Swiss-Prot record:
It comes from the Bacteria. This is Ribosomal protein L11 methyltransferase. The gene is prmA. S-adenosyl-L-methionine binds at T135, G156, D179, N225. The lineage of its organism: Bacteria, Pseudomonadati, Chlorobiota, Chlorobiia, Chlorobiales. The keyword Transferase applies. It is an enzyme of class 2 (transferase). GO terms for biological process: methylation. Pfam families: PrmA. It comes from Chlorobaculum tepidum (strain ATCC 49652 / DSM 12025 / NBRC 103806 / TLS) (Chlorobium tepidum).
Amino acid sequence: MQPPKTHNHIELAFEIDSDLYELYIAVLSQVGIEYFLEDDHKLLAYLPESDWNADKEASINIMLQETFGSVPRFTASFMADRNWNAEWEAHLQPVEISDRFLIIQHQKEYDVKPGQIVIAINPKMSFGTGYHATTRLMLRQMEELDLADKKIMDIGTGTGVLAIAARKLGNRNPILAFDNNAWAAENAVENVAENDVADIRVELLDAEEELAATLEEGYDLILANINKNVLDRILPTIRRHAPNAQVLLSGVLVYDEPWLKQLLKRIKYTNVKTIYEDEWLSALVEPKN
């Protein structure tokens, strides 16, 4: 799989209080922005140059206005192709997800506690470094599950961290991990190799266009750490085409929990367990038969 032909990006710089970073990331992710850096007094968001136009700017302004009641001033700057990996690595430190999980940069040495599961990530600009609360919530939920014999699908895999974690938690069946972003899919392939985990199939797929046919392969657990808008569209598809599968999801803000409960009720899922961190939640749900 090849990364996009151009790596030129637009950098959006928001001068906001750091307490608002998580909320802004949630809002901006709903208009298709996936890559962020947290700098001193600024949240930096990146999107491919080809995606930046008047309609995208208008969508951002509308989302910010609806969420915050006003549109904060932000700048948009062209960023030529650069070593994004170096940019990312300069900001990354090891992340202790729990007593059991540690996420580190690839090819770096860290002190590891006895019994700790280590996941080495070379993140490029893919989602899933452990720095975002939704990734941490998903991993903490996964720790509590018996994954050994489940056939697992990871939708929007990003760095591949959840699929890798499933294998390191003892899963013995084939795992399908996919993303609709070529750069992310390539990154996940690299991280699977870096962690020396076998039988994880990484694909470049569109969750909304190709999900139904892919689900026909038969899955027991669907991992979906993606944004609310995508969840709204794909959960009914999962319910129809994987009628017995559990779904572990995140990417939903706490204030959107009423929406999630209504959706789950409508498509006949029951909530097994929900956990929270900051403004985010993760829910494990299963079919109500």
